[in-house]
Amino acid sequence: MITIKSFEFNYFQENTFLLYDDTREAVLIDCGCCRKEEEKELTDFILENKLTLKHLLCTHLHVDHVFGNGFIYKTYGLKPEANKQDVEKLPSPDEQAKLFGLRQHVENVPVEKYIVGGEIIKLGTSELQVLTVPGHSPGSIAFYNKKNGFAIVGDALFAGSIGRTDLWGGNQEVLVAAIHDKLLSLPDETVIYPGHGPETRVIDEKFNNPYL
């Protein structure tokens, strides 16, 4: 059984997800913490629940989703894992921050491992399947667990909306096609955990999302 703990971090109210199972092994997805109190909230939870952090995963490499990568590397020695397309086609996090008018320096921790569609990532005795959902960014991916019926989708799909496509390498036609192909094809009751805002379900987005 996978437990999902969500945190709302940084100026963009980004959802950071910490997943762990009965083995107490954990993966961190889209670490967006950028303030001392946010870093403490995250590390306190990991410590109090006796978790061992095994992976730092990224659905995509926009700055609001990677603010905390430097902190995680310094604290736990983990480097991010992400899709190669984002590594090659997006500006560095610090460059992105400046373009958004942010004064805070964002450390660019090199991606240690490229993640590809169809790959299986181990989480204790559980698994996460990688789904490719480009369009919001060239290398956007999602993490799906069939047994527990959920997908962590980054900024590809939201409750009642979809990701913006006016940033580096974004493409609305590609995004909508990827959502239909990879996300709406999942079982109707699959819970969707987006990068911002509340969770939703596949069936709700099939019938209620005006962008699809």
Features from the language model and the residues they span:
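Conserved beta-strand hairpin/beta-sheet module of binuclear metal-dependent hydrolase folds
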Residues: 1-49, 142-154
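Short Gly/Pro-enriched turn/cap motifs at secondary-structure boundaries
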Residues: 7-8, 104, 110-112, 132-134
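Residue-level detector of beta-strand structural context in well-folded domains
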Residues: 17, 113, 118-119, 141, ...
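Residue-level marker for buried hydrophobic side chains located in beta-strands
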Residues: 27, 57, 80, 152, ...
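Short catalytic-loop micro-motif centered on adjacent basic/acidic residues
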Residues: 28-30, 55-57, 130-132
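Metallo-beta-lactamase
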Residues: 33-34, 96, 126-212
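Active-site HxH/HxHxD metal-binding segment of metal-dependent hydrolases
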Residues: 34-39, 43-122, 208-211
